[in-house]
UniProtKB/Swiss-Prot annotation:
Signal peptide: none
CDD domains reported in the protein's UniProt record: DSRM_RNAse_III_family (cd10845), RIBOc (cd00593)
Annotated organism of origin: Staphylococcus aureus (strain Mu3 / ATCC 700698)
Protein name: Ribonuclease 3
GO biological process: mRNA processing; regulation of gene expression; rRNA processing; tRNA processing
Residue span(s) of domain DRBM: 172-241
Gene transcribed to yield this protein: rnc
Lineage start: Bacteria, Bacillati, Bacillota, Bacilli, Bacillales
Subunit record text: Homodimer.
Keywords, sorted A to Z: Cytoplasm, Endonuclease, Hydrolase, Magnesium, Metal-binding, mRNA processing, Nuclease, RNA-binding, rRNA processing, rRNA-binding, tRNA processing
An annotated Gene Ontology molecular function: ribonuclease III activity
Binding site for Mg(2+): E59, D132, E135
Taxonomic superkingdom: Bacteria
GO CC annotation terms, alphabetical: cytoplasm
Residue ranges, compositional bias (Basic and acidic residues): 219-231
Regions annotated as coiled coil: none
Length: 243
């Protein structure tokens, strides 16, 4: 592709990025960093640019910054959870499906600069590509403005999803319920599978929550894990109401 075409695409990106940051309530200093964050390798290849101008290095940095930010959030939010639980929660928050949700929610997926072939084959909707760009954006934001601004961005874009349980398995109800029971000194929690029905391709599982030797709630799901999650959710709500 021609230099003129590249210039048109880049200028269009910069205008859209400026508008997006204004919508989100953030400023920026180094637009080149953000352009790199959204430059997929296919875009770089199409215009014969330096192979290090794509977003993979920023993705590497952003991954570490995101883990640190989420770790601090969980450490403060759940003072009674052991390291193992915190690690599982963090892993789910920073996993690919969650990052895609964050990116799509604010339209960052629309900002990605792709090569012509990648665009035609549906690259813009590819989860791995979107999550990589989101991490690269976090890396660019960190380099441009520091960890405090990354934290403010996470408060606006990431943490609300976690707190409202909008991400499947992020603040999983079994963990949430276990933490609550521990805080209230109510004893041990166990789960029993009490029913499994339906054909092999469409099974329905029913599990119950046992607290202090008594079944206090049930949940149904397409998997044993899902039924336990739903049972924990029901039990958690019941105990919160009783309190």
């Amino acid at each position: 592709m021609s230099k003129q075409k590249k210039s048109e695409i880049v200028n269009r990106f910069r205008k859209r990025f400026d508008t997006k940051m204004t919508e989100l309530g953030f400023t920026y200093q180094n637009i080149d960093l953000y352009q790199q964050a959204f430059s997929h390798s296919s875009f770089i290849n199409d215009f014969n640019m330096n192979r290090l101008d794509h977003n993979e290095r920023l993705e590497f940095l952003g991954d570490a910054v995101l883990e640190l930010t989420v770790s601090r959030y969980l450490f403060d939010k759940h003072p009674n959870l052991p390291e193992g639980n915190l690690t599982k929660m963090r892993a789910t928050i920073v996993c690919e499906p969650s990052l895609v949700i964050f990116a799509n929610k604010i339209g960052l997926n629309e900002m990605i600069l792709l090569g012509k072939g990648e665009e035609k084959t549906g690259g813009r909707t590819r989860p791995s590509l979107i999550s990589d760009a989101f991490e690269a954006f976090i890396g660019a934001l960190y380099l441009d403005q520091g960890l405090d601004i990354v934290w403010k961005f996470a408060e606006k874009v990431i943490f609300p999803h976690v707190e409202q349980n909008e991400l499947l398995g992020v603040v999983d109800f079994k963990t949430q319920f276990q933490e609550y029971v521990h805080q209230q000194n109510k004893g041990d929690v166990t789960y029993n599978l009490i029913k499994e029905e339906g054909p092999a391709h469409h099974r329905l599982f029913t599990s119950e929550v046992i607290l202090q030797g008594e079944a206090i709630a049930e949940g149904k799901g397409k998997t044993k894990k899902e039924s336990e999650q739903r049972a924990a959710k029901s039990a958690y709500k019941q105990l919160k109401q009783i309190k």
